[in-house]
């Protein structure tokens, strides 16, 4: 190409968290299949159905939280299967794509929860309001066990 304003780069550069984190106030937005009460993210598999690889999610999550003034958002609908399944889960049904220690902000149509730097108990308190109201009570009962352990 001949346009000097365009630079073609490999994903080894464009997905490099160290490169991206140099951008000030970078906000990254990724999706998920489900998020557990402590902020662990599954973006790969639903039950036995493998839906795809990580697609650079971990790189962009880490870049967002390392960027000066930046954030990393994981956005997902609160339910699946026409409202029959909560995507805010007690336990993930698939692998952990993004670890809880990398979770920054989780967003559903019911709000946003800032998780970075929070205890496991506080994370559960912040995650439950993100679930559809039909699922909050069973999630709260499960979260009570996490809180009871004192984490």
Question: Residue locations for each model-derived region?
Answer:
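Conserved phosphate- and dinucleotide-binding cores of soluble alpha/beta proteins
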Residues: 1-151
């Amino acid at each position: 190409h001949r346009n000097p304003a365009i630079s073609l780069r490999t994903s080894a550069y464009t997905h490099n968290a160290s490169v991206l984190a140099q951008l000030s106030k970078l906000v990254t937005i990724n999706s998920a299949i489900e998020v557990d009460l402590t902020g662990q993210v599954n973006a790969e598999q639903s039950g036995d159905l493998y839906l795809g690889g990580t697609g650079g999610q971990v790189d962009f999550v880490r870049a967002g939280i390392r960027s000066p003034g930046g954030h990393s958002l994981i956005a997902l609908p609160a339910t699946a299967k026409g409202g029959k399944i909560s995507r805010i889960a007690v336990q993930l049904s698939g692998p952990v794509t993004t670890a809880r220690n990398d979770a920054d902000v989780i967003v559903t149509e019911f709000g946003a929860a800032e998780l970075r730097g929070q205890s496991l108990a506080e994370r559960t308190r912040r995650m439950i309001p993100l679930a559809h109201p039909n699922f909050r009570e069973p999630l709260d009962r499960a979260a009570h066990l996490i809180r009871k352990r004192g984490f």
